[in-house]
UniProtKB/Swiss-Prot annotation:
It catalyses: phosphonoacetaldehyde + H2O = acetaldehyde + phosphate + H(+). Its cofactor is Mg(2+). The keyword Cytoplasm does not apply. The keyword Phosphoprotein does not apply. Its EC number is 3.11.1.1. Binds 1 Mg(2+) ion per subunit. GO terms for cellular component: cytosol. Gene3D superfamilies: HAD superfamily/HAD-like (3.40.50.1000), Putative phosphatase, domain 2 (1.10.150.240). Keywords: Hydrolase, Magnesium, Metal-binding, Schiff base. The gene is phnX. One of its GO terms (biological process) is DNA repair. Belongs to the HAD-like hydrolase superfamily. PhnX family. InterPro entries: HAD-like_hydrolase_sf (IPR050155), HAD-like_sf (IPR036412), HAD_2 (IPR041492), HAD_sf (IPR023214), PGP-like_dom2 (IPR023198), Phosphonoacetald_hydro (IPR006323). This is Phosphonoacetaldehyde hydrolase.
Length: 269
């Protein structure tokens, strides 16, 4: 038994270093509604279906209280949908510019494909948004074998496992033990754990780290290591089986997992 399928998240994992396309829009729509939110608050639910992300932000105690202070009432589902409509409109204006593959992604995918591994993908974006992302990413060299969005699973995105299961079905994966899910948020890790597949957090370029490429490269070596260790701990506390610093580390990790699977088989025999 060995790994046959890898499922990658998109923004912050495969493209868009730091996952800035949605974050900047979340900050803007709340600012426009009279409620200032922090970068940390905007990032915390990252990886979820975007309307769920907005609802989760509104439920955060500080934002909830600030919303009530500004609007003189608790937020409503109408507020959620109004914010989401603004989010979608503003995101579509800039989404195409946030589709560059992160370093090592295309080379790693090619290397593992040559070893017979198939690549699926999941996302917190809708079908409509992903039409832009997939088209642009393909022109830049990144195109997984399959994509599932929350739209295709009745809006039951992360942390539900259904997008992973749909990928497994389409790609012919025989066992959850032969599937690795790589993502850059705690929602990705929870999705993988709920699906029973290997949960791997990628650190550099992740939404969880929250730095642009320029910001990360401007850090000293010591500061970079501190940021890496902090992000790694968050993934591990969420339950990740493994973490990798960049996608360049994925082939070696898959060899490690394959050895673990082989040892399990030998132990049973």
């Amino acid at each position: 038994m060995k790994i046959e399928t890898v499922i990658l998240d998109w923004a912050g994992t495969a493209v868009d270093f730091g996952c800035f396309a949605p974050v900047n829009v979340f900050l803007t729509i709340f600012e426009d509604a009279g409620v200032t939110v922090t970068l940390e608050e905007a990032r915390k639910p990252m990886g979820m279906l975007k309307i769920d992300h907005i609802r989760t932000m509104l439920e955060m105690p500080r934002i909830n209280e600030e919303w009530k202070r500004v609007h003189r009432q608790h937020f409503t589902e109408e507020d959620v949908h109004l914010l989401y409509n603004q989010f979608e409109s503003k995101l579509m204006e800039s989404l195409a510019t946030y589709t560059d593959p992160i370093q090592h992604v295309t080379a790693t995918v090619q290397q593992l494909r040559e070893a017979g591994i198939r690549f699926g993908s999941t996302t917190g974006y809708t079908d409509f948004m992903m039409e832009v992302v997939t088209k642009q990413a393909a022109t830049k060299g990144y195109q997984p074998d399959f994509l599932v969005t929350p739209t295709q699973v009745s809006d039951k995105g992360r942390p539900y496992p259904y997008m992973i299961f749909r990928n497994m079905e389409a790609l012919g994966a025989k066992s959850t033990k032969q599937v690795v899910k790589v993502g850059d948020t705690t929602s990705d890790i929870k999705e993988a754990l709920n699906a029973g597949v290997w949960a791997v957090g990628v650190i550099i370029g992740s939404s969880e780290m929250g730095l642009s490429e320029e910001e990360f490269l401007a850090l000293t070596a010591e500061e970079q290591q501190q940021a890496i260790e902090k992000t790694k701990r968050i993934f591990e506390m969420t339950g990740a089986h493994y973490t990798i610093e960049t996608m360049k580390d994925l082939p070696i990790l898959i060899n490690t997992i394959n050895e673990e699977l082989a040892n399990e088989t030998n132990d049973r025999n």
